[in-house]
Amino acid sequence: MKNLRGLLLAFLVLSLGISDFLRAQDQQGFISLDCGLQADESPYTEPLTKLTFTSDADFIKSGKSGKIQNVPGMEYIKPYTVLRYFPDGVRNCYTLIVIQGTNYLIVAMFTYGNYDNLNTHPKFDLYLGPNIWTTVDLQRNVNGTRAEIIHIPRSTSLQICLVKTGTTTPLISALELRPLRNNTYIPQSGSLKTLFRVHLTDSKETVRYPEDVHDRLWSPFFMPEWRLLRTSLTVNTSDDNGYDIPEDVVVTAATPANVSSPLTISWNLETPDDLVYAYLHVAEIQSLRENDTREFNISAGQDVNYGPVSPDEFLVGTLFNTSPVKCEGGTCHLQLIKTPKSTLPPLLNAIEAFITVEFPQSETNANDVLAIKSIETSYGLSRISWQGDPCVPQQLLWDGLTCEYTNMSTPPRIHSLDLSSSELTGIIVPEIQNLTELKKLDFSNNNLTGGVPEFLAKMKSLLVINLSGNNLSGSVPQALLNKVKNGLKLNIQGNPNLCFSSSCNKKKNSIMLPVVASLASLAAIIAMIALLFVCIKRRSSSRKGPSPSQQSIETIKKRYTYAEVLAMTKKFERVLGKGGFGMVYHGYINGTEEVAVKLLSPSSAQGYKEFKTEVELLLRVYHTNLVSLVGYCDEKDHLALIYQYMVNGDLKKHFSGSSIISWVDRLNIAVDAASGLEYLHIGCKPLIVHRDVKSSNILLDDQLQAKLADFGLSRSFPIGDESHVSTLVAGTFGYLDHEYYQTNRLSEKSDVYSFGVVLLEIITNKPVIDHNRDMPHIAEWVKLMLTRGDISNIMDPKLQGVYDSGSAWKALELAMTCVNPSSLKRPNMSHVVHELKECLVSENNRTRDIDTSRSMDINLSFGTDVNPKAR
């Protein structure tokens, strides 16, 4: 008998016979990536399938684009005419955001098409996370092949990796994910790798989306030994079992031409030990006469029998084996056998067959993965090997890591991190402390600045720390020095500005590798302080607050004269705004660099103390989400702060005006502002509390990147274990933490409260205080609205419902947690940043799930010897 594969190769094109409006369906949850499509190309609707594809550039950080040549006798739809190939690295991985615990149909398409003019068809492995999924062999399937699996992700991140196994270059044409119902296609263990999916018909039509709402590909298959049944009546496919079989698949069926014979389908397996699941979809599509009976048993070998089965008239049902079957000799035989009392032969409309694929290797501990990826992002690392799972499989371990492996079912843990000689800049980032099993840290021979963070002493697992050859400064935390006495190996050689006491003026010999401050540098600093002290002392004694002679500003930033301030602002020609400090003017430095000049008003409620606080803070901190201080003026009665100019002004202005900020931009702004606060709380030593977080103190540049501003009320905590300080209450009404107001006890959680209020502004576009509401304060109003359970009445109506409801709910819940009356129940800013980034990922994923309509078949085969054949 003729093998089904030969027939499948003949049926290449899907006819388009139904009008578009009948075919229109929802692609909610679909991910359709055109691999190799240029990053700057917009998502497009494929003209034949009407499926919406987008570039894969945002989901992978490696690879190059290629375009296939024309293949005689083959026609490919647009997504399969370009590809991404991977000449560099062994493992190259896509990272997709998915819903944990959801059943997904995952499809990967591969077309070589001699894109490189080498006529060298590749062969490589395909992985899901740390486990092998299948081998892609384009040497055997020269016209292209399709890999398909039904899989339930264990986390919200799914990694699909192409792994080089020989000398040829891996490639991929398209990547597609389709959510399925969670009560369908459930094996006893593992995932289901598709062997074939066919509907029994003599037509040439392949059925997929939108007739199939899950975009399963149903290829036509029929043999001469069979008799075709067809109906023009409606077949009810709304079966309670949830398989959603398309009606086009079940309006035809096959029965044996010889009514006494069984209906038999056989297929070969690649490996004799494969375990098989078969799903039979049956519906009686004939109106049976009173004396007619159709009843049959199903046999899949000596030990597997099921029945009798009597298909329901014009109602589809799905039959499947609940336990996997092993086919003797690697050949499966499925028979539908007529029972003695049946007057009609057996009937079958469609069949799917799968083998189980076990994924025994656990992924690396989720917290370790999150931490190492945050470190990668913070330092802007771009290592070709840093793709996929950090620790497994072991032969693909990320460069610079070592991991601990217990067994395959236990998630590996990261035990050492070596980023020596990696051109790192910036501070030692706080995400390191989230590697809770880290034993060795090597950041030597980089250009790291800032201090040695206190959190290193709190990492109980750390045994070795190498920070030598950097530009670290300040004193080494005493707690860390105490751990050296208890066996910690600490190397800080080659950091000339690092010392071992808070005064940084003594040489200690009790440390492994002491650091000596340069006496010449110290003398220069003292001279600068003295000079500035003299200048400040000359200021008018009429100024309110502590005299300059009592409090000087230590700085290495540019100090401008008042005449220079007049020149850069053209005598204060253009006003940008007004704040508690005074007027803010636009200016230019050197005629090119735009700046904002904040001039202290003689009547300002803020005075020299807050001016000094802001200057000193901005001189010792740097973060991309904090406004940068360009310089200052301190000349007699003239005080001015000179900042980088932020083109789009403050966030509050955008909410009070007519401009509309999209939901994704709002989330980006929230992430930026939260990251700035996180740096103040964790990245600074001692930690800094802003004390005046509000929407008017969040400035936006030309790309809508947000930066925190106005640090005049900020407070540094003393070094030690204190969780709060007692201080006079300062801040802005509406944003002010009630607990801080009542107790005078300030902590970083006071900033968290204020940020929660800002986040509610971002979500609702409502004023913080509105006495026309039943609940004047925004947090109380939102709390009231939440009792009604309708988020649409809370979200800013300017958004017109264009947002991912999941991300909106998550952001709203986060904001309400931040404004909890009890500071103990509020999250820290690191948690806030993490949650907001997840909201952002969900929203970005939504923009790729665009509704489309019709579908067309692909023209690729399943591969060799995995398709059924009739007998």
UniProtKB/Swiss-Prot annotation:
GO molecular function: ATP binding; protein serine kinase activity; protein serine/threonine kinase activity
Keywords, comma-separated and alphabetical: ATP-binding, Glycoprotein, Kinase, Leucine-rich repeat, Membrane, Nucleotide-binding, Phosphoprotein, Receptor, Repeat, Serine/threonine-protein kinase, Signal, Transferase, Transmembrane, Transmembrane helix
Residue positions where Phosphoserine is found in the record: S696, S726
LRR repeats: 413-436, 437-459, 461-482
Residues annotated with Phosphotyrosine modification: Y643, Y740
Cytoplasmic side, ranges: 537-871
Compartments (UniProt record): Membrane
Membrane topology: Single-pass type I membrane protein
A GO CC term assigned to this protein in UniProt: membrane
A Pfam family: LRR_8
Signal peptide extent: 1-24
Family label: Belongs to the protein kinase superfamily. Ser/Thr protein kinase family.
The protein, known as: Probable LRR receptor-like serine/threonine-protein kinase At1g07560
Species of provenance: Arabidopsis thaliana
Lineage: Eukaryota, Viridiplantae, Streptophyta, Embryophyta, Tracheophyta
